[in-house]
Design a protein with these regions (language model features):
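Aromatic "clamp/platform" in nucleotide-sugar-dependent glycosyltransferases that forms part
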Residues: 263, 282
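N-terminal strand-loop element at the rim of the active site
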Residues: 3-5, 9-73, 167, 240-242, ...
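A short helix/loop element that forms part of the nucleotide-sugar donor recognition site in Leloir-type
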Residues: 78, 181-195, 339
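A conserved mid-protein helix/loop that constitutes part of the nucleotide-sugar donor-binding site
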Residues: 20-25, 200, 204-223, 240-246
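A short, active-site helix/loop in glycosyltransferases that binds the activated sugar's phosphate group
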Residues: 143-181
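Nucleotide-activated donor-binding/catalytic signature segment of Leloir-type glycosyltransferases, i.e.
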Residues: 246-262
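Short His-centered aromatic/hydrophobic patch
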Residues: 93-101, 118
């Protein structure tokens, strides 16, 4: 495939999201003398990772946002882009809502390998969600390979039949586990910085979006606070619903005990300040943040809507979203107490031996990108 393979990653944005963070982890670790990443995104707004991408040698290109009514204009823009760019050996589409449009265009333009990569097990509500499902309905026929971060994401994006027949390659959201290893010095530093020295800290990392269920997080925390006045809720992330959640915290009378810390990069040190990790999402693909929390040695209470594949240690407990906030609060206290009594010192070691660790996974990706042999991703 030539001296340096150029892989084009197609995304919505280059902001601090789950898929974007995982791709950047891979980008930082990959042999960039042999493999270089470029990015095709659907906004001209500057993204969180833009500067780093350019520093690492990548290019950022732009497509118009897809709005259904501009289907033909969108497809025309895709054709124009790939007609003027013949340098890519692979196109990896993480934005699967329109992958059935841009991947066939890329293939017809001469790109040797196209990949559709399922990153989420759900869709937005209403008309937008219906359109996404419609566009994905035959995506499996419009790409060379299908990758997925979990079983649930595979079924949601490519269909149950494709997953059950083993046609979808499982590629978990890997993290650099050594960055998250428990660090007492960093714990003290971050807790001191945010005034958490004597607090019971419940942490969450995620974009303020419908899927993340922040309103339920606040309800759960209100119950915890009734039982423990030293409790604090530590929320990392940003997004369209942040202001709404800040207002809800005020309405619940818990605003003084909730910290909206915004986006943080690197995020790893902030896990050290937490005592327990809360993640009651409505839907997910494979939440890398839960893998990160386990690498940091945190007990995790997560919704049973999330794939069991995310449980890579015994630190994860699942609970139904049908249960009320009071029961979630009780479970948080229980797992945090149990964790204090029995520290699992092997968490980081266990993760580092699997392809949930980016240092392990990058070797698979390098072989795949250089050879086009997808079987190396299945080892």
């Amino acid at each position: 495939m030539g001296k340096q393979v150029r892989v084009l990653h197609v995304l919505g944005t280059t902001n601090l999201g789950g898929a974007e963070s995982r791709i950047m982890d891979l980008y930082r670790h990959i042999d960039r003398e042999k493999i270089q990443f470029d990015f095709l995104i659907h906004t001209t707004k500057e993204g969180f990772f833009d500067r780093e991408i350019k520093q690492l040698g990548g290019n950022i290109y732009y497509l118009p946002s897809f709005r259904v009514y501009n289907y033909f204009a969108y497809k025309k823009a895709c054709k124009a882009f790939f007609a003027s760019h013949n340098e890519f050996q692979m196109v990896q589409g993480h934005m699967t809502s329109t992958a059935s449009i841009y991947l066939p265009v890329a293939k017809k333009a001469g790109v040797p390998v196209t990949i559709a990569h399922a990153r989420s097990a759900g869709v937005d509500k209403g008309l937008k969600g219906w359109i996404t499902k419609f566009l994905r309905r035959n995506l499996h026929r419009k790409c060379d390979y299908m990758f997925s971060c979990s079983d649930l994401a595979a079924s949601a994006v490519f269909g149950e039949k494709q997953y059950k027949e083993g046609k979808v390659v499982f590629v978990p959201n890997a993290v650099d586990t050594k960055d998250f290893a428990p660090d007492e010095h960093m714990r003290e530093k971050i807790r001191r910085e945010y005034g958490l020295e004597n607090s019971f800290v419940i942490g969450h990392v995620g974009r303020f979006h419908y899927a993340k269920n922040h309103e339920f997080i606040l309800d759960i925390f209100a119950e915890v606070l009734n039982q423990n006045k030293k409790a604090k809720l530590f929320l990392l992330g940003d997004g369209p619903r942040r202001q709404e959640m800040e207002e809800k915290a005020a309405e619940l009378g818990i605003k003084e005990s909730v910290i909206f810390a915004g986006n943080q990069n690197p995020v790893a040190p902030y896990y050290q300040a937490m005592d327990v990790f809360l993640f009651p999402s409505r839907f997910e693909g494979m939440p890398g943040t839960v893998v990160e929390a386990q690498a940091a040695g945190l007990p995790c209470l997560i919704a049973d809507t999330i794939t069991t594949q995310v449980k890579v240690t015994e630190l994860v407990t699942f609970l139904s979203l049908a249960q009320d906030a009071e029961l979630w609060a009780e479970q948080l206290n229980r797992i945090a107490t149990e964790r204090k009594m029995q520290k699992n010192t092997e968490t980081e070691i266990d993760l580092s031996k699997t392809n949930y660790d980016v240092n392990y996974q990058v070797k698979q990706y390098e072989q795949f990108y250089l050879t086009g042999d997808v079987t190396v991703m299945k080892k």
